[in-house]
């Protein structure tokens, strides 16, 4: 896949997450897919959100389901870019997660972050 010719959406998904970014992109100019009911931007650089239960991004899994309903806060980029975020959260339920997603469309994306499984925070990645 040649990424430099594609427009990619980048976001942070989170459960009770706080995402801080020092990138030039203003959080106030980003867009939502599946906007959660409760969210806010603090000090122009920190995104805080409450993610609805049982929402996620998962594609044709061995579990037998596909979902595309998690909160997705993104900016669209073409060509090369750099992303840097700090994530913290209140992990409570198995599969609570937060991180970054590079997304072309509902069938083509990569998400990487931290996921709560078996009472522990684990590094997690899903590639479609």
Residue ranges and their predicted role:
Residues 1-26:
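Bacterial Sec-dependent N-terminal signal peptides
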Residues 25-128:
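Extracellular glycan-recognition regions
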């Amino acid at each position: 896949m040649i990424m430099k010719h594609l427009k990619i959406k980048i976001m942070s998904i989170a459960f009770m997450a706080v995402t801080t970014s020092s990138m030039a992109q203003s959080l106030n100019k980003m867009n939502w897919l599946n906007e959660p009911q409760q969210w806010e931007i603090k000090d122009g650089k920190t995104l805080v959100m409450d993610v609805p239960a049982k929402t996620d991004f998962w594609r044709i899994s061995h579990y037998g389901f596909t979902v595309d309903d998690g909160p997705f806060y993104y900016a669209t980029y073409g060509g090369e870019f750099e992303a840097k975020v700090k994530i913290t959260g209140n992990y409570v339920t198995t599969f609570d997660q937060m991180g970054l997603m590079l997304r072309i469309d509902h069938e083509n994306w990569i998400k990487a972050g931290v996921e709560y499984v078996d009472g522990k925070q684990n590094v997690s990645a899903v590639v479609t």
